[in-house]
């Protein structure tokens, strides 16, 4: 079976502004939003901590767009799974412009992440633009007790089981 390629983008970040909700002539919702992802590192020469933030344009369609418009706000942390798409248009001066966006459509995922004390909601759409999975994840922050195990008590079997 020949592969035609894979176009999948996974991002976790924070919204830079409230989602912008619009409706197409057929009544389907479309949301445009910007998502910031950051990476941190230590400069080898100065020892100084550095940070680089990358901004991503995200476009959601259908029910995911409606949910994002209702529940997400500037600063919300969100997990996005979609595909990368570049489109071209002409600006007011007739110049060709390009933009690259992460499209979250059929088969895409948006998961609203929260702080440590909030719950998380996961929403995925199938081919018919129907929500196929919504789950609430309870976050338990209680500390776990770790018991020390004496390595002399562990019975290592020298034989490989296959």
Curated annotation (Swiss-Prot):
Please give the Gene Ontology molecular function terms for this protein. single-stranded DNA binding
For this protein, the record's CDD domains field holds:
SSB_OBF (cd04496)
Gene that this sequence comes from: ssb
**Statement: the UniProt record of this protein carries the keyword DNA damage:** yes
This protein's name: Single-stranded DNA-binding protein
Q: Which Pfam families match?
A: SSB
Provide the assembly information. Answer: Homotetramer.
Which of UniProt's keywords are assigned here?
DNA damage, DNA recombination, DNA repair, DNA replication, DNA-binding
Which function does this protein serve? Answer: Plays an important role in DNA replication, recombination and repair. Binds to ssDNA and to an array of partner proteins to recruit them to their sites of action during DNA metabolism.
Motif Important for interaction with partner proteins location, chain numbering? 157-162
Species annotation: Buchnera aphidicola subsp. Schizaphis graminum (strain Sg)
Which PROSITE patterns does this UniProt record tie to the protein? SSB (PS50935)
